[in-house]
Amino acid sequence: MAVVARTAEQMRQWATTLLDALGGEQRAQAALPFADDGARRWLEYRPLSRPGACVAEASPAARKAAHRLLSTALSDHGYAQAAVIMALEEVLDRREGWWRGRHSDDYWVSVFGDPAGHSAWSWRFEGHHLSVTMTVQDEEISPAPIFLGANPAAVRFGDRPVSRPLGPEEDLGRELLQSLDAEQRAAATVGGSAPYDIRSGTRPRAPESLQPLGIAAGALDATQRALLDELLTLYVGRLSPGLG
């Protein structure tokens, strides 16, 4: 708990620093009531505008404070993944012919409630393929929802990867799948193709049952279970120590 308490204090510090560094209009955009469920439960991983202050329009001091706030929620490798995901906006813009005007600072930050007060408050850092929300109550933190994606998933020089921010997740997932025998794979395979998008989309509540599908962890052998545990640890390990 001491680790989480320190993280909560760091979040308070950098959320306050961020708000102080923002100008009047941007501060009004970023500082929102905790009771505003519509804005607080917002989830949008597509490249669209959203509630909050845009990092691209902030001063250098405010941009740095926004990144310091984001870094309080993430581990070293989690923050590295987030930073590369944001940088890939420039690569994607080039691949699309620059017509869309994507920018690596087109991310928005919001603070809900008063981080210097004694009531629950939360913050969100969000943009294309990146959404991180943390809710803080005293010395406790609820680290959800959090989403990391990547486009392009990989940039290569021939067969050599130049950038592949979510490569470990993909590699471990495929390694686990390849380890399954025919019967296990039949149980684990729940569709012939991947879903078009995230099942719950951008809705704050899932519209359908999230009844678990696939193969139970208890049906895996020791080697397969170790791969599953490593994969889960990788995902949970995106968070700062004590939050997973």
State each model region's role.
Residues 215-244:
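Extended, compositionally biased non-globular segments
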Residues 37-214:
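Acidic/His-rich structured neighborhood in mature extracellular/periplasmic domains
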Residues 30-32, 188-190, 229-230:
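Short hydrophobic alpha-helical segments that form membrane-spanning helices or hydrophobic packing faces
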Residues 11-18, 26, 62-65, 169-176, ...:
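Stable alpha-helical elements in mature extracytoplasmic
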